[in-house]
Amino acid sequence: RFEKKMEAQPNSEAKVEIRTFKDHYEENKHIVYTIREEMAKKTPLSQIAILYRTNQGPRQLIGALMAYNIPFYMQDAVPNLFDHWISKNIIDYMKLARGDMRRSTFLRVMNRPKRYISREYLTDSEVSFDDLLEKVKDKPWLYEYVEDFKEDLRIMKNMTPLMAINYIRKSVGYNAYISEYARFRKIQEEEFTHVLEELQESAKGYDTYEEWFDHIREYTEELNRQSKENGESKEGVVV
């Protein structure tokens, strides 16, 4: 935490500006633009601080600072958005759509939302929809679930990450799954929808899954580096 010392500055020329933005994406763009303006004026980055109410607040901003190569360091550890189980579910759907049909990946999302697919049908390390459909052909209702799952992944194959997240939430039925899960666990649904909204913000501007996955790797590496260097002398914008 920062030690705070507050003093009135009646003669200060600086003014407090209050701005509102339609979303975090636009807000972060403005923050980056303002910092770059200060950098052009040779303002020391150590004189710039970005304050948030909680340590989850700056998750999207960190990605924006990295994209523009703006040095920064964090006073507190920031939870990695992409480590959340909901994020991992969304990423697993994308991996399946790209053709990564490993049994372990398939198992994690095959019943999110509920499709009543039993793990007993998955006997190989790689899942084949043709084999799975053959095994459930005597159960028309289950056959339809599996066919729909296969078709959803086919449709997602060439989507942008943002389009895919929207599709998973609405067309695949992940929003309904989250609602049911929250009711069952007696947890506020907003906690989960907030994660999905943050994922959507993160995915903006990426054309392919590979590009977004590269960003996720770089973001995770930076968080890990910041965590290891915590307490050391640092230069950059303070977050």
Stretches found by the model and what they are:
Residues 1-71, 98:
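Helicase P-loop NTPase motor core
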Residues 7, 77-80, 228-229:
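Short, solvent-exposed loop/turn elements at beta->coil junctions and helix N-caps
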Residues 21-24, 51-55, 79, 114, ...:
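Short beta->alpha junction loops/turns
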Residues 75-98:
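Short alpha-helix plus adjacent loop in nuclease-associated cores
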